Amino acid sequence: PFSENEQALGFPKEAMNLMKLVLKSDSPIAGKTLREADLRHRVQALIVGIERGAQKILNPESDFRMDAGDIVWIVGESKKIRSFLESK
């Protein structure tokens, strides 16, 4: 649930999900940089963190290349994100 301050921003609850996804080798964003993946414009989502083994990267740079097996933390509407990531 959202706090009063978050509700006051006017964002619908479903648009503010924090998702944790493991990138598969056939993911449309595996092997791409954040800039190339362009999730911000494609599905109105932001990648806020990436875990690669023991390495944890908060707010990765746009030239960071994502690999299969990376754990990606994304903020956005889960329905849009899943639909995009499941497309081939």
Enumerate the language-model features and the residues they cover.
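Cytosolic regulatory regions of ion transport systems
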Residues: P1-K88
